[in-house]
A protein has these predicted regions:
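Alpha-helical subdomain
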Residues: 1-76, 170-171, 175-344
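Conserved Class I S-adenosyl-L-methionine-dependent methyltransferase catalytic core
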Residues: 2-5, 11-41, 52-174
Length: 344
């Protein structure tokens, strides 16, 4: 029985794990070469046509096209390659849910840091920035990397915001405070979903400027405002809101700092107000799901935080006095659920 069981085992799953970077780098190279935007709205390309357009040899052009087709990013019709539906929807510049910014950030910022994951595990220190020179990942001296980061967050957040807005009813709470709201992606999408909603993005001054630009581009300046501030340094959060949103924020920080943020949320909310914590939630058994567990490792190379469980968030909220605690699950790239609490 033991021998037969051993023979049934296969290293193929390990091969898939070990070569996972092949998949990502194929996607990243195609994005770097702007392949999907080039193909959008066309009858497709041949290997020779792509080689000519990119001024490269036909051999690598054919190999890239074959790889992207195998991954479901392209479809081959006769000898011509066209975008698959998922590539056309999410990897073409200018599309509403363009995801390419996140791919670029992974390639330029996170891929090198993940190459030092073993070091991060041994030292319990981030590897995408130098903790001896910076107080956090947001203090980067390289404006280009910061721009890449925030564009990536906008890509990741836009579709996630729509999933959140469809999973949680905001129709009876017209005033939203988005704490650490980044480029205002959540606010833009939620205001599009809820015509009566108004929102305020509370962010660091340099990020608030990015948010203001995105809001103006979206034509929502009458419904979304930006307020510059620091949720650690400032003594209090702005008040007068029905709902406070913490979207992909708390996983950046250790427990004591998360509790400090939530304490300020409690103080800012009126009776009946809600706090919504949207994250890739690790399950209470701490066995997955994979996206949340791996995002937690990503927090190791990026931050002092980790991805927490619903039980942990509920405990912190309960300690502050929040009631009607519940977890709502949904499917999106940046979050798989939200923990909600109401101030009595």
């Amino acid at each position: 029985m033991t021998v037969n069981a051993d023979r049934a085992l296969s290293p193929v799953p390990l091969m898939q794990l070990a070569t996972g970077f092949w998949v990502f780098k194929t996607l990243a190279a195609a994005h770097e070469l702007d392949l999907f935007s080039r193909l959008s709205g066309t009858t497709g390309t041949t290997a020779g046509g792509l080689a000519e357009a990119l001024a490269i040899e036909e051999r690598p052009a054919e190999m890239l096209l074959t790889g992207c087709t195998a991954l479901g990013l392209l479809v081959k019709n006769d000898d011509r390659y066209v975008n698959s539906p998922i590539a056309e929807e999410f990897l073409v510049r200018g599309k509403p849910y363009y995801f390419g910014g996140f791919v670029q950030m992974l390639d330029q910022r996170l891929y090198p840091g993940w190459g030092r994951l073993g070091e991060a595990i041994r030292t319990n220190r981030p590897t995408t920035w130098d903790p001896d020179r910076q107080s956090s990942m947001f203090d980067s001296e390289d404006p280009r990397l910061l721009a890449v980061f925030w564009e990536a967050m906008h890509s990741l957040s836009t579709f996630t915001a729509r999933a959140l807005g469809q999973a949680i009813d905001l129709s009876g709470a017209p005033r939203l405070l988005d704490v650490g709201g980044g480029s205002a992606a959540f606010d833009i999408e939620l205001c599009r979903l809820y015509p009566d909603l108004t929102a305020t993005v509370f962010e660091l001054p340099n990020v608030a400027d990015i948010a203001a630009r995105k809001v103006k581009e979206a034509g929502l300046t009458k419904r979304i405002e930006t307020v510059a501030g620091d949720f650690f340094a400032d003594s209090a959060l702005p008040g007068g809101y029905d709902t406070i949103l913490l979207s992909m924020i708390l996983h950046d920080w250790a427990e004591d700092r998360c509790r400090a943020i939530l304490q300020k949320c409690w103080a800012a909310l009126p009776s009946g107000g809600r706090v919504i914590i949207a994250e890739l939630l690790v399950n209470d058994a701490r066995t997955g799901p994979p996206a949340a567990a791996l995002m937690s490792l990503n927090m190791l190379v990026e931050t002092e935080g980790r991805n927490y469980t619903p039980a942990e968030y509920r405990a912190w909220l309960r300690d502050l006095g929040f009631q009607d605690l519940r977890t709502v699950w949904f499917e999106a790239a940046g979050a798989n659920g939200a923990v909600i609490g109401r101030k009595p």
